Amino acid sequence: MRHYEIVFMVHPDQSEQVPGMIERYSATITNAAGQIHRLEDWGRRQLAYPINKLHKAHYVLLNVEAPQEAIDELETNFRFNDAVIRSMVMRVKHAVTEASPMVKAKDERRGDRREDFANETADDADAGDSEE
């Protein structure tokens, strides 16, 4: 079986349906004896340019190992699902399992916020001790 990277963008008004879509597409892959190596829900993001007069979309990334029949079925599902505004399926040489740069950047920002919060609470505790 070959390895694929799949990205699809969902209409922002249909963001509530994304978990169900992910479940359905994941089931399609696993039922065809495929394997999901990485699944990332990037959430609602700004588009680089408007698509169908939309400026935002909900992004989902999948890295899978699956037979061609499963990929064909996924592409057909993307094509006939009105909520999916764009999709891209690329064949890659090896399975990709590490976090994508999008998730790494998000985690770094979250880590910086945690450190800032920890520093603020420590400063507040120090200030409270000196007042007594």
Swiss-Prot record:
GO molecular function list: small ribosomal subunit rRNA binding; structural constituent of ribosome
Gene3D superfamilies in the record: 3.30.70.60
InterPro entries xrefs: Ribosomal_bS6, Ribosomal_bS6_CS, Ribosomal_bS6_sf, Ribosomal_S6_plastid/chlpt, Transl_elong_EF1B/ribsomal_bS6
Biased composition (Acidic residues): 121-132
Region called Disordered, residue ranges: 99-132
Listed Basic and acidic residues bias regions: 104-117
GO annotation terms (biological process): translation
Keyword list, A-Z: Ribonucleoprotein, Ribosomal protein, RNA-binding, rRNA-binding
Gene Ontology CC, one term: cytosolic small ribosomal subunit
Highest taxon of the lineage: Bacteria
SUPFAM superfamilies: Ribosomal protein S6
Residues in the signal sequence: none
Similarity remark: Belongs to the bacterial ribosomal protein bS6 family.
Cited function: Binds together with bS18 to 16S ribosomal RNA.
The protein, known as: Small ribosomal subunit protein bS6
Organism annotation: Serratia proteamaculans (strain 568)
Origin organism lineage: Bacteria, Pseudomonadati, Pseudomonadota, Gammaproteobacteria, Enterobacterales
